[in-house]
Design a protein with these regions (language model features):
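Active-site-proximal loop/hinge segments that shape catalytic or ion-binding/gating pockets
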Residues: 2-183
Length: 183
């Protein structure tokens, strides 16, 4: 518990991160999940990385990603991060819905971006061409105009940039999920 709490320490220059998000009108972050996962999120009081869940025998009813995405997470040392997006209409979300998944969109306070170990990726962090890190320059690499676009098609030059990510180390406490009680 104490170890988890230590992950909530803010970056020393967190106000600079807040200024960039504010300049770009980012007021909420998003995480989509299968509706069947909501009870588990409530029970364990937050969103946890799949790696943390594995280590602590927390069963995820419908885990996101597959074997390949987990291999990529490990390759890029991102296996202990919870993925968030700047956009409400992530292309992966659309694909999963067409496959019949019952998804819900969780809204997360931007404050998680200020945690010391939170990183930012300019595109989907599973993409071999991504750049990620936890410095201000990494956040500045995000193409916020692309993240604000709606229903971006694969042919659009902003398709990859639309999928920029916020990578929160290990967990997001339930108090940061503003709409959890809507489900």
């Amino acid at each position: 518990e104490r170890e988890l709490q230590s992950l909530l320490t803010k970056k020393s220059n967190w106000q600079e991160f807040a200024a960039i998000l504010n300049q770009n009108k980012i007021t909420v972050l998003y995480h989509f999940t299968e509706k069947a996962n909501i009870n588990s999120i409530k029970r364990y009081k937050g969103l946890f990385s799949w790696y943390y869940c594995d280590l602590n025998n927390i069963a995820i009813p419908f885990p996101g990603g597959d074997i390949n995405s987990r291999k990529l997470d490990k390759r890029y040392n991102l296996h202990d991060f919870v993925r968030l997006s700047f956009c409400e209409d992530h292309p992966m979300q659309h694909r999963l819905k067409t496959e019949g998944k019952n998804l819900v969109l969780l809204k997360v306070k931007v404050d998680v971006a200020f945690f010391e170990n939170t990183s930012f990726s300019d595109i989907n962090a599973a993409d071999s061409g991504h750049n990620h890190g936890n410095e201000l320059e990494d956040l500045k690499r995000v193409n916020f105009d692309a993240t604000r676009k709606r229903f971006v098609r694969k042919e659009d030059p902003d398709f990859k940039f639309h999928q920029a990510e916020i990578l929160v180390k290990t967990w997001i406490p339930i108090d940061y999920i503003t709409n959890i009680n809507d489900f």
